[in-house]
């Protein structure tokens, strides 16, 4: 396994002339039995990287749809050990890169070294910790790197150029640009300031840049071409599954 796996998968999509697709689903959603079926369908039907949420009781950075889904998973008893055990069982059938996203507390309780070791053994390629400041995460990033796991840097509109440059020194996998998309007349549009921020990120980072901003419809991908290398979507997928449709159907529309 390589620490560059996530970047490699996104760059493969770029070589095909398209954006990398990164669907997000909270671990154990919509239920224990169906979750891995959804993950395998996402992989089979074109996901380049699959992002699995680590449920947490206080998901301060999540929107209402993701938060509600994550809290349901917690109520169902989903935890990190369950996610890693299931991933170990299914990883050989998944060609996409695999990324875990969540908060620091569950990882800290698991034990940092033990987590890194178990996550690597399960086939995790990258990790996003939404509430871990860069300065506090340097040692953890180095620990993860020992196990070929990339700690993904998070940036956004409020990230100054000098801080982006700092993040870029230790960044592996890809840069995750967090944004809230404005809506006008029911059609989501990308504000000019976001476009400028993305241009800055592309200039600073020598790894791919992915945008997570609440994609609602496939037509929005067109607007991102040339601005980012990959797009993350979570709420749209959760709503799709909630409506009784499959992940395979979702990917066919977005691919």
Curated annotation (Swiss-Prot):
It comes from the Bacteria. Its EC number is 4.2.1.20. PROSITE patterns: TRP_SYNTHASE_ALPHA. GO terms for cellular component: cytosol. It catalyses: (1S,2R)-1-C-(indol-3-yl)glycerol 3-phosphate + L-serine = D-glyceraldehyde 3-phosphate + L-tryptophan + H2O. Pfam families: Trp_syntA. One of its GO terms (molecular function) is tryptophan synthase activity. The active site is at 51 (proton acceptor), 62 (proton acceptor). Keywords: Amino-acid biosynthesis, Aromatic amino acid biosynthesis, Lyase, Tryptophan biosynthesis. InterPro entries: Aldolase_TIM, RibuloseP-bd_barrel, Trp_synthase_alpha_AS, Trp_synthase_suA. Pathway: Amino-acid biosynthesis; L-tryptophan biosynthesis; L-tryptophan from chorismate: step 5/5. Signal peptide: none annotated. It is an enzyme of class 4 (lyase). The keyword Phosphoprotein does not apply. Tetramer of two alpha and two beta chains. The alpha subunit is responsible for the aldol cleavage of indoleglycerol phosphate to indole and glyceraldehyde 3-phosphate. PANTHER family: TRYPTOPHAN SYNTHASE ALPHA CHAIN, CHLOROPLASTIC (PTHR43406:SF1), TRYPTOPHAN SYNTHASE, ALPHA CHAIN (PTHR43406). Belongs to the TrpA family. This is Tryptophan synthase alpha chain. The gene is trpA.
């Amino acid at each position: 396994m390589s620490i560059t796996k996530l970047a490699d998968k996104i760059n493969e999509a770029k070589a095909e002339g398209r954006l990398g697709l990164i669907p997000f689903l909270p671990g154990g959603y919509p239920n224990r039995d169906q979750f891995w079926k959804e993950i395998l369908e996402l992989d089979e039907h074109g996901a380049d990287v699959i992002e699995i949420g680590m449920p947490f009781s206080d998901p301060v950075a999540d929107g209402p749809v993701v938060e509600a889904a994550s809290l349901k998973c917690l109520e169902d008893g989903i935890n990190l050990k369950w996610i890693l055990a299931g991933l170990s069982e299914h990883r050989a059938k998944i060609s996409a890169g695999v990324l875990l996203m969540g908060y620091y507390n569950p990882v800290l309780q698991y034990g940092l070294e033990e987590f890194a070791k178990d996550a690597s053994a399960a086939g995790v390629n990258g990790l996003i910790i939404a509430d871990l400041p860069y300065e506090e995460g340097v040692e953890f990033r180095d620990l993860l790197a020992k196990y070929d796991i990339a700690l993904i840097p998070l940036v956004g509109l409020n990230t100054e150029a000098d801080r982006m440059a700092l993040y870029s020194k230790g960044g592996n996998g890809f840069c995750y640009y967090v944004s809230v998309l404005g809506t006008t007349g029911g059609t989501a549009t990308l504000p000019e300031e976001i476009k400028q921020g993305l241009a800055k990120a592309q200039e600073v980072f020598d790894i791919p840049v992915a945008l997570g901003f609440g994609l609602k419809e496939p037509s929005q991908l067109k607007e991102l071409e040339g601005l980012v290398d990959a797009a993350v979507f979570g709420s749209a997928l959760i709503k799709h599954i909630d409506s009784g449709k499959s992940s395979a159907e979702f990917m066919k529309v977005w691919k």
